[in-house]
A protein has these predicted regions:
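Short, glycine/polar-rich helix-capping loops at beta-to-alpha or helix-loop-helix junctions
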Residues: 54-61
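Short, conserved active-site loop motifs that form the nucleotide-linked donor/cofactor pocket
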Residues: 47, 68-69
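An alpha-beta-alpha
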Residues: 40-41, 45-54
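Short, structured patches in soluble enzyme cores that scaffold and shape functional sites
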Residues: 1, 25, 51-54, 72-74, ...
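Catalytic cores of soluble, metal-dependent hydrolases
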Residues: 69-181
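Short, glycine/acidic-enriched loop or turn micro-motifs at the edges of active sites
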Residues: 3-4, 54, 103-107
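Active-site histidine-anchored catalytic micro-motif
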Residues: 1-36, 40, 137-141
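Active-site flanking residues adjacent to catalytic metal/cofactor-binding acidic residues
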Residues: 1, 50, 99-103
Length: 181
């Protein structure tokens, strides 16, 4: 069953943007999770968080008490071997891998209209390179990009361009799969 064996690689869990991870993992709002058809929740050992740089104390406690794996910004940007190792680990225990990115994980210069940015994030091209590595694997099947500033919060369309860079990275990974599918 798809929803029983899906893995998430999460960009950042701060503020309410982390709520979907907690719900999906069965750590909060159990009725919401069940009503969405996700029962049981995703095992925390099937979740990898990347480039997390700013957790409030309660979030930090919850994440540290779980089996969530982590990839640092440096890992995502400079260690494709570690990215591949996490994807391979997840592929052994899941049917489908979902990659989720909250745009506030990026370098604040690329998402200037986002209220939750934190310094020292990867650029969209850097994270796009990590997405290329991830999406080379056939079990990496879905990408979510959330909280992209738009309209008056992105007058120069920098955030939109950053989101496109992420999509291009993922699509390049799919293109490089054997068989190109």
């Amino acid at each position: 069953c798809f929803h029983r064996r899906v893995a998430s690689i999460i960009g950042r869990a701060a503020d309410v943007s982390g709520a979907p991870v907690a719900v999906a993992a069965g750590l909060a709002l159990h009725n919401l999770r069940r009503e969405s058809g996700l029962d049981p929740g995703i095992l925390t050992e099937h979740i990898v968080m990347g480039a997390v740089r700013d957790l409030d104390p309660l979030e930090r406690e919850l994440v540290e008490a779980s089996n969530i794996e982590h990839l640092s910004t440096d890992d995502l940007v400079n260690r494709p071997d570690l990215v591949r190792a996490q994807i391979e680990r997840l592929a052994r225990v899941t049917d489908v891998i979902y990659v989720h990115i909250d745009m506030d994980v990026l370098d604040p210069r690329e998402v200037p209209g986002h209220p939750l940015t934190v310094p020292n994030g990867p650029t969209s091209l850097e994270l796009g390179g990590a997405l290329t590595e991830m999406f080379k694997h056939p079990k990496v099947a879905a990408l979510g990009i959330a909280s992209t500033p738009a309209n008056e919060r992105d007058p120069d369309r920098l955030s939109l361009a950053a989101a496109y860079n992420l999509l291009k990275g993922a699509l390049e990974g799919v293109r490089r799969r054997s068989g190109g599918r």
